[in-house]
Amino acid sequence: MKFFALFIHRPVATTLLTLAIALAGILGFRLLPVAPLPQVDFPVIMVSASLPGASPETMASSVATPLERSLGRIAGVSEMTSTSSLGSTRIIMVFDFDRDINGAARDVQAAINAAQSLLPTGMPSRPTYRKANPSDAPIMIMTLTSDLYSPAQLYDYASTQLAQKLSQINGVGDVTVGGSSLPAVRVALNPQALFNQGVSLDAVRQTISNANQRRPQGAVEDGQQRWQLRTNDALQTASEYQPLVVHYNNGAAVRLSDVATVQDSVQDVRNAGMSRGKPAVLLVIRKTADANVIETVDRIRAELPELHEIIPAAINLEVAQDRSPTIRASLEEVEQSLMIAVALVILVVFVFLRSGRATLIPAVAVPVSLIGTFAAMYLCGFSLNNLSLMALTIATGFVVDDAIVVLENIARHVEAGMKPMAAALKGVREVGFTVLSMSLSLIAVFLPLLMTGGLIGRFFAEFSITLSVAILISLFVSVTLTPMMCAYLLKPHAPRSQPQRRGVGRLLLAVQRGYARSLTVVLNHARWVLLLLLGTVALTVWLFISIPKTFLPEQDTGRLSGFISADQSISFQAMRGKLEDFMKIVGADPDVSSVVGFTGGMRTNMGLMFISLKPLSERKDTAQAVIARLRAKLANEPGANLYLNAVQDIRVGGREANASYQYSLLSDDLAALRTWEPKIRQAFTALPELADVNSDQQDKGSEMALTYDRASMARLGINVSEANALLNDAFGQRQISTIYQPLNQYKVVMEVDPRYTQDISALNQMFVINSEGKPIPLAWFAKWQPANAPLSVNHEGLSAASTISFNLPEGVSLSQASEAIERTMTALGVPSSVRGSFAGTAQAFQQSQSSQLWLMLAAIAAVYIVLGILYESYVHPLTILSTLPSAGVGALLALALFDTPFSLIALIGILLLIGIVKKNAIMMVDFALEAERNGNLSPRDAIFQACLLRFRPILMTTLAALFGALPLVLTSGDGAELRQPLGITIAGGLIMSQLLTLYTTPVVYLMMDKLRRKKRTQTINATQH
């Protein structure tokens, strides 16, 4: 063909074109960002609203529900959940993949504005939103500690200055400040003193509010000068509030200090953070959905010197945990695997061809194909991540195949005595169509993946496109650079004097002769081979159905998250003690590097810990082994449970949970949900396939239910509004005024002095001043009794919801756990009013299960169509595809042998095998058809000769692909758990297919030929009659 000759006869142009591809790839490599995995995060927006002192049920009905109704009208929302706790509501909105996060944010703001008129008037601020997923693991955690500054002052610096600067960094989605609260002036009232003076709590509130005002006063001017008016209307510190007059009693002033303790304190006293055994304020940084982890972390670290400058020297700002080191280490491991794979496949070529000059050709072609791929990756907006680098590692065995097929055929002609230039022209013409068929049919495997939407399509896109581009570049290089180098580098009659070369050559010749004898026997017993092939198909189906399955392999990222759940009626002080105890035990583990944690806020029975493990090279055990060890140590800790999870790079959904997987219960009947949730949770706990079973239903908190006697209230001259104001003033940490300062605003918080609220008898000291100015004790018009109350109320899609979370015990797959859950739900007879479904990662797994088989069938169909077009035949593609069952059996048996569940990574391996193993059949069928057409050979002689002639390149390409996957199988460093399933699948499939297809393909070829001839004969006979 003139196309091939053009490059062979113009070596300078071909060389420069190759250099251009390589240089473009090098430039692309330097510009590519780095990430752990392809960008598959769902767009998530978190809406927050607060109403201090409001119960969870009040927050759910008056705040969450109006917002949810308005937000639920936004297009592209795939999931909306909310959690309402004491004084706080948080709504998590997960959008479809194709929804632009900025456009979604504008719609969210519009929906908040539309719902504003339906929200309570007492809210201190409008609802706000953040473009971040609170369930995502932080990319960095900073701590502030000091021996000089109080936690409140540290929190002030963190929230006022540091969080503001960090939030401005590109890629930062949310900065959560925890461990304390903003400074505030706290007014702790003495109810007995108030009663003695005849002063109501609400009168104190109004006095303080009126005394602290920031209003414009205007200006005074005459004809020549203008004076701005300024008054001392604002109060800043506790000492300025103490002398305020709240009442006159018989002409004597009753000052605030007479009836209350006023001090500079914090806005919420129920917050605590710890780091290294000391009180600390934490800055928990999360990225936006579309941000790159490494780039964002690098930008944050670049800002650290400036951050240190804006805080006092006595404050110690440290990076306690950083997600990037393990990501970088994992990518270094993949890069090493890639280099090893390149070296191994070149070694295969050298062993078979026994020529340094011949080996030099693929030694150039392979790196050029791989390096050139980086340019396309940059243009496509991809990153250097575990999947894209794995694609290049596997591609090493593919791209060398094209070079091997061309090189081996040209070398065969040279060894037969032909001159290199003539051999190059003839050899590339003979196998040009073969190489094209091999490459295009391999790329066809990925077409269904590229058309698949959702998580799987996004997850596979980079891998598929990267591998396809590498194959296309390899195809171009193999028919241009490879024959040109053969024409000028190969020498006719190459010496064979070295004993090692003679030994390798004799060994290959002996193996080929043995194959010829065994093939003769097989062709004489074709029926048995066909039965074996059918048995292989049946075994493949059975193995695929029965093998344990999971979503993605469990990663060891060197990070653990710990959720502490205590009794729902526990006090904040007791919960803080639990946090300290757990952190001390976890921090003492030899494989733990650092632990930070905090508790408090609106859910005082919960604590959160972030645990960083030592680098994998410095610790004895994996993350799961560390979790198992800590779980055993903490099993007998009284009063609280610690749930530990290994942080994963991919987390589906926006739910914050105490375990890795979730099962969601929904109902429009809250009573039915609260009845059935404990039964379902107990049944799940008894399942051996589940571990760490827990629920987010918090309905066992203690409350004191007050019942108003409305008739008595009317007679006494008071109303419900005044009574509720009394309770809020006394026990709600009510924010009654705002202190304005240049950098921030702080609150004045009023409540009854905690010394008088140690037990429920404090209610007996509460009173309301009626319309006649008389103090009316609360007990005169209200009765109270203890009851259970929810600490939080959860919604999903406007329905009441409860989420049961669970982990997997060692040796149990997600498919086994899912089947156990479905059996249990059926056995329990749960009513239709309570709906159960998997959520988060478990839901994504269920969806992937339904699509995996269709993806494989679609890939096979795509390959068949491409081969049918190339061969202009309905029959020959079936011969080529008959190689697939043996590869499937080998892959699934290898996974079972290594005790590895079938995951999305293994699915990639299966799809790759569909493209790989058919190469052997293509080389056989091409040469057999050529021999039939031009050599006038019978079908049996043609396929027999094709098998022998192509035995060496088949063996070379198979071993090259096998050695390309071998580094992934043997890897043991960071990220090995992601790479091993791919390597195991490909290696197992290649070994089994190599053993079987050398015999099954010629048998199927002859069977198909008989069918084709029989049909042709029948057609001729029908025409004649």
Swiss-Prot record:
Pfam families named in the record: ACR_tran (PF00873)
Coiled-coil region list: none
Protein's membrane topology: Multi-pass membrane protein
GO cellular component: plasma membrane
UniProt keyword annotation of Cell inner membrane present: yes
Source domain of life: Bacteria
Keyword Chloroplast attributed: no
Gene3D superfamilies assigned to the protein according to its UniProt record, in alphabetical order: Multidrug efflux transporter AcrB pore domain, Multidrug efflux transporter AcrB pore domain like, Multidrug efflux transporter AcrB TolC docking domain, DN and DC subdomains, Multidrug efflux transporter AcrB transmembrane domain
Swiss-Prot/TrEMBL keywords: Cell inner membrane, Cell membrane, Membrane, Transmembrane, Transmembrane helix, Transport
Gene Ontology MF terms in the entry: xenobiotic transmembrane transporter activity
Residues that span the membrane, as ranges: 16-36, 333-353, 360-380, 387-407, 431-451, 459-479, 528-548, 853-873, 875-895, 897-917, 953-973, 984-1004
Location (main, coarse): membrane
Subunit and interaction comment: Part of a tripartite efflux system composed of MdtA, MdtB and MdtC. MdtC forms a heteromultimer with MdtB.
Protein name per UniProt: Multidrug resistance protein MdtC
